[in-house]
């Protein structure tokens, strides 16, 4: 039986009369990639920020690795890695300097070059953050989530704004992080991303979970209703063409 590492029960978040999250419940299993999928405004990021201890909930219960969010937020922070957005980094510092800075905040020894190697940025170690491309910035931000050797990694829309090759490289990185033992939770509004990455997804709309299962199960259930696509699925799509023409792994992000 899979161990539940995050349990959310009847989570609700209101801003005045507006309900951003409407009493949702779900579990995340240890070692899986779990996705919160939905359009903008569905409540994905709000839910993630509550679990990360970054935003107060209105009501409900959140347990993280056996710890109650209400009683042990500081202990929860010690076992999670949260992806920072670009505004969270000093643009004039090098990647080595930034890693050492964040390691100092965690009061934890770290091997900066090992972290950079994990995200294929060792050749950028002495580059300033502002000199990185969009894909490189995203990979570096994920590297910083791993400084405290977290049990759970949270990634909020990790591939937004990236080109197709950079997105696929980031997918490989996320799978690699999971293969090393971490549980990963992502939010996304990309259907292909959820299908490729996630073991299970919760589909949110207007603050409610309207479906929760593996991508394959959700697709099979839809097909079982008699649903058919209006045109035949081809062996490749336009994104595959783009990546093939631009050189795959040779292309600089």
Task: Give, region by region, the residue ranges found by the protein language model.
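Conserved ABC ATPase "signature" region
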Residues: 100, 104, 109-124
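ABC ATPase "signature
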Residues: 212-213
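Conserved catalytic motifs of ABC-family nucleotide-binding domains
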Residues: 149
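Conserved ABC transporter NBD signature motif
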Residues: 60-68, 75-76
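Catalytic Walker B motif of ABC-type/P-loop ATPase nucleotide-binding domains
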Residues: 153-157
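Conserved ABC ATPase signature
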Residues: 128-132
